[in-house]
């Protein structure tokens, strides 16, 4: 049985239950979690979610702790940006 369509994606399994807003949020989160990301160690797009906040590269085998549904959180990006600025200022 085919459980989803182009519009609703993986949340097609819920049918008309739970309301549209909740299903849209769940769809976005599930798509982000299932997506393959670029590995920060080897650079290949093989980083896959193993469990909550644990990401494993299929090529080099690196295990990385990240966000629950994406390998990099918004707060983590902001911190890395601030660190880069500090390093650049010290180099000048």
Swiss-Prot record:
A zinc finger (C4-type) spans 39-60. It comes from the Archaea. Its cofactor is Zn(2+). InterPro entries: Ribosomal_eL37/eL43 (IPR011331), Ribosomal_eL43 (IPR002674), Ribosomal_protein_eL43 (IPR050522), Ribosomal_zn-bd (IPR011332). Pfam families: Ribosomal_L37ae. Zn(2+) binds at residues 39, 42, 57, 60. Gene3D superfamilies: 2.20.25.30. The keyword Membrane does not apply. Binds 1 zinc ion per subunit. The keyword rRNA-binding applies. GO terms for biological process: translation. GO terms for molecular function: large ribosomal subunit rRNA binding; structural constituent of ribosome; zinc ion binding. One of its GO terms (cellular component) is ribonucleoprotein complex. Keywords: Metal-binding, Ribonucleoprotein, Ribosomal protein, RNA-binding, rRNA-binding, Zinc, Zinc-finger. Binds to the 23S rRNA. Belongs to the eukaryotic ribosomal protein eL43 family. Putative zinc-binding subfamily. Part of the 50S ribosomal subunit. This is Large ribosomal subunit protein eL43. The lineage of its organism: Archaea, Methanobacteriati, Methanobacteriota, Methanomada group, Methanococci.
């Amino acid at each position: 049985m085919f459980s989803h369509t182009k519009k609703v994606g993986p949340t097609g399994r819920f049918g008309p239950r739970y309301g549209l807003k909740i299903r849209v949020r769940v769809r976005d989160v599930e798509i982000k979690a299932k997506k393959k990301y670029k590995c920060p160690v080897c650079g290949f797009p093989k980083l896959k979610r193993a469990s909550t906040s644990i990401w494993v590269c299929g090529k080099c085998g690196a295990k990385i702790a990240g966000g629950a549904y994406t390998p990099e959180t918004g707060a983590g990006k902001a911190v890395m940006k601030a660190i880069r600025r500090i390093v650049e200022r010290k180099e000048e």
